[in-house]
Regions:
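Beta-propeller domains
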Residues: 1-153
Length: 153
């Protein structure tokens, strides 16, 4: 457990709306994001937008006690305050290294990220429609916090 970590389970995604005509702002919370069904203290961080539909974003589920990325959550921004988010968790003893990238293959959207399990590094693909995850072992160590970008060539 990371005892130096100050914020434990307090960072949540909020929607800020700014009306440029009236200069009024509002903050909306999603009650479902306050209580994701996981058995650890968590923060949500590093939101990224879907490439197929700007209505959806994906956030990193960060285990605040262990200092590890345990999964990702899909959030509907059009129905923010009432939508139940879709949660994608890594298998036991597997952790993400950083925020995912959204990639499209064969008309399907995936989250692609580096991950690790027992000192081995992987590239993991999560199908956001089915929730299935496939991981491919890579022959080098990828450290936690490694940021990346994937692009088509």
């Amino acid at each position: 457990e990371n005892t130096d970590h100050i914020i434990r389970g307090k960072l949540r995604l909020k929607q800020f709306t700014i009306n440029t005509k009236t200069n009024k702002t509002s903050i909306v919370e999603n009650p479902y994001l306050q209580h994701i069904d996981v058995n650890f203290h968590y923060n949500l961080d590093f939101p990224i937008q879907s490439k197929r539909n700007s209505q959806f974003i994906y956030c990193t589920i960060f285990d605040s006690a262990m200092g590890l990325i345990r999964g990702y959550v899909k959030v509907d921004t059009y129905n923010f305050h009432e939508s139940i988010p879709r949660v994608f968790l890594f298998p036991k003893h597997m952790y993400g290294n950083s925020e995912p990238q959204v990639v499209e293959m064969n008309n399907e959207e995936y989250l692609m990220t580096f991950s690790n399990r027992f000192e081995k590094s992987y590239i993991s693909l999560i199908n956001v429609k089915t929730g299935s995850m496939n991981s491919i072992n890579i022959p080098t160590r990828i450290p936690p916090g490694f940021h990346s970008i994937f692009y088509d060539r």
